[in-house]
């Protein structure tokens, strides 16, 4: 069992947890993830390790409420215990001193960018960070990323904060004034990673993306996380999660990731109804005892 030591709401439907997991904390490197299960009835979900403290034996994870399991996770509180935390899984991010590197985070993908950006900065790189979100309230980890970045940019779809537009617009602006960028790391919604990869392909700028397809065991046994990379089949959990963005078949990835969206929506709606029923019973009992 893994104790939740702290919980913080970062934005609507986005929650940060610090969890006691000594082994994972000791072994964690940037790019690693865990497979988490809240309880006996919960499904297994992959989450990136955002940070770790080997001395304290803790890891930090950030989850966005999308389906039933992430909703269940969001309801956990400080002092509660998670049933399973398996990891660290996946290959660590290869860290090099490129000179100048751009890290791009979209939505909750910003949480995955943070440990990689930190490692790249510690390796001596000039770090340019771009964070994109739909609106100001959904921008996360701004303070943390500003502290390690040589230049920090925000884009929002609605223009409520930073530059109105897409992360590719901000990337284009930066590349026009600095041609020394040697690599781009882009993590976020598939459509965003695809757009960044398509933007950098014609100019031959190395671009790395982190893929989070449907995943169950995290060890390559189930094959659910298979992705097409340069016409070869790879497994994101053991061959990734990071790949050359110019080699990823994003169309196939988007199709596969939509496979269970309808079922996920139905499951979440049923869970919300169940929670509402429990609240009604609790309120009725409280009223009866008043």
Question: Model-derived features: where do they sit?
Answer:
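Ferredoxin-reductase
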Residues: 1-78
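Structural signal for conserved beta-strand scaffold positions within catalytic alpha/beta enzyme cores
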Residues: 6, 51, 154-156, 209, ...
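A generic structural signal for residues embedded in beta-strands
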Residues: 36, 84-85, 227
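Short, surface-exposed secondary-structure boundary micro-motifs
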Residues: 39, 87-88, 230
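Short, Lys/Arg- and Gly-enriched loop/turn segments at beta-strand edges
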Residues: 42-51, 89-96, 237
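FNR/FR-type flavoprotein reductase catalytic core
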Residues: 71-216
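Local cysteine-cluster metal-coordination motifs and their immediate loop/turn environment
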Residues: 112, 190-191, 212-242, 275-284
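Short Fe-S-cluster ligation motifs
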Residues: 235-239, 243-290
